[in-house]
Regions:
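An N-terminal JmjN-like helical accessory module and its immediate linker preceding a catalytic domain
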Residues: 1-16
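Active-site region of the double-stranded beta-helix
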Residues: 16-116, 124-155
């Protein structure tokens, strides 16, 4: 359902000239707008205004937590992902289509399906584990406290 909107967004981002530094939506010094690595397409940070109205409607519930640094992660099947890592700030991940699992530190994997979300507190090691089901996920940093009842899975 959301693939068409995401593909159009990726095409739009791909037509941009080389990113300039500093990029107001990207705190890193990377100039790549998106990259394809080990089966996963990921974008650099995207302004919320770049998303379609359908995707913005999904994000509306979380705007009160002041999200920023939106990134898309898409795969058409099983992929290796990016391995164990920690993020700066609390991370909110929303599965808008498909399915993905996350392993947080040494816990059992939790599965996110379409519409599910997960909050991972700053400093908690985690990694995504894709499945054979195509997926689209949005990741962002939140600047305000997110209560556990606002997300499907909570690792605060």
């Amino acid at each position: 359902m959301y693939w068409e909107e995401i593909i159009e967004l990726i095409k739009t981002l791909g037509n941009e000239p080389n990113s300039t530094f500093p990029n107001p939506y990207n705190e890193s010094d990377e100039y790549e707008i998106y990259k394809y690595e080990r089966g996963t397409l990921s974008t650099s940070y995207i302004n919320i205004e770049e998303f379609s109205e359908e995707v913005k409607n999904i994000l509306n519930k979380y705007l009160k937590y002041e999200p920023e640094n939106f990134q898309l992660f898409c795969s058409l099947g099983a992929s290796d992902g990016f391995g164990p890592h920690e993020d700066i700030g609390d991370t909110l991940i929303i599965c808008i289509e498909g399915q993905i699992s996350y392993i947080i530190e040494n816990t059992k994997p939790v599965v996110l399906k379409s519409g599910d979300s997960i909050l991972i507190a700053e400093g908690r090691e985690h990694m995504g584990v894709s499945s054979t089901i195509p997926r689209i996920c949005i990741s962002c940093r939140v600047n305000r406290y997110v209560p556990s009842d606002e997300v499907t899975h909570y690792f605060g």
